[in-house]
Amino acid sequence: MRVLAIDPGTVRLGLALSDPSGTIAQPLSVLARRSEAEDLETLRALVERHEIGQIVIGLPRTMEGRLEAAALHAQAFGSKVEQATGRPVAYWDERLTTVAAERYLIDQGKRRSKRRQEVDRMAATLLLQGYLDYQRGRGPGG
């Protein structure tokens, strides 16, 4: 079963996709946010095209593990994604995924302008791989 990860932001949605076995995460794309209705329709079409069985949404927690405004927005968005796609939505702790993605892209020699374009989908990929590893019993989780 393929899993789609969404790293939600106010300007962009980072997207990552698992392989068909649900083992390996790979970057998919970055969706520039428009209206909520357009975003949900785009996600619905992606779910159908890639035969997604599960969706994982990054849940931004504070370093102390608390849920604040951004996390509540992510949960509200997740409920709408679940309704629009008909697929179950899980939430996964996304603390430090953007920092790790940025470091990875710097290590790869990506210029700042290119990093801005890629960091959201790389963060979604790290988020998804953490979720997949946890589901397989291989890693710590959220």
Predicted regions, residues:
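Phosphate- and other anionic-substrate recognition elements at nucleic-acid/protein interfaces
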Residues: M1-I6, T10-G142
